[in-house]
Amino acid sequence: MFVIHGSSRQNGNTEALTHMMIEGIETEQIYLRDHTVYPITDQRHDAEGFQPVNDDYKQLTNRMLEHDTIIFATPLYWYGMSGHMKNFVDRWSQSLRDTSLHFKEKMKGKKMYVVIVGGDNPKLKALPLIAQFQYIFDFVGSSFEGYVIGDANGLDEIKNDAEALTKAQLYNDKFKNSEQK
């Protein structure tokens, strides 16, 4: 299992909820805030394709592709995914353009989960972001297996969202049961 943390804040509510979801599960986790993933100019239609970029994207993507289950964890920033997460996903265009990577083939059939935490009625207002992830996963042939939306804004407020905690625990149980098979 691979976890992509998109928050710019260490030990925030999104991380806390995600950690509850994966407690006791063997995972590889990356924190995008600790890596450099530059935005790029869209060169999908240029004859030469994208220009090489000296950052961590390729290494992070290669690590992601080694796993069958991936969790995308992002705070709800202005009703969308974090900038760190958006840069990472936007760069998939570069991976799709380079046919030698076989990116879409490697993404096909992967099981995807999403964790989103935010304030201002996120159980409703994060739903467009859930739909966005669904469309992204559909495009690359991955299977959207589920999501958890947490309602929290201040430090450690996620502990007050019983519904999100319960759902995270249910996924944790599911992951543990599937590891035993």
Language model segments and positions:
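N-terminal beta1-alpha1-beta2 submodule of the flavodoxin-like/Rossmannoid cofactor-binding fold
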Residues: M1-T99, A162-K181
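Short histidine/acidic/glycine/proline-rich micro-motifs that form metal-
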Residues: S8-N11, L76-Y79, G119-K123, N153-D156
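A short acidic, helix-capping loop that chelates divalent metal ions and anchors anionic groups
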Residues: Y38-T41, A152-I158
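Short, glycine-/small-residue-rich phosphate/pyrophosphate-handling segment
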Residues: L101-E145
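Juxtamembrane/interfacial segments around transmembrane helices
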Residues: Y113, E157-T166
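Beta-strand-loop-alpha "switch" segments that mediate conformational coupling across diverse proteins
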Residues: G146-D151
